[in-house]
Amino acid sequence: MSETEVVFDRRMLEALICPRSHETLKYDQERQELISETANLAYPIRNGIPVMLIDEARVLD
């Protein structure tokens, strides 16, 4: 991680839910994604900000 990279604040997990399933999310620090196991989607985190758009989410294998 570079010095200028913004880190995701894990406290945000308490307030965020998956926009598709309305379930809680898990944080994948290595991939910088929020995972919705119910919806089978991974939402990217860019510059420390979760992108909670279904169209931007990656479908999990």
Curated annotation (Swiss-Prot):
**The organism sits in which domain of life?**
Bacteria
Q: Which Pfam families match?
A: Trm112p (PF03966)
Q: Which residues cross the membrane?
A: none
Q: What's a single GO CC term here?
A: cytosol
| UniProt record similarity statement | Belongs to the UPF0434 family.
Q: Which HAMAP family match?
A: UPF0434
Name-wise, this protein is UPF0434 protein RD1_0037
Q: What species is given as this protein's source?
A: Roseobacter denitrificans (strain ATCC 33942 / OCh 114)
Lineage here is: Bacteria, Pseudomonadati, Pseudomonadota, Alphaproteobacteria, Rhodobacterales
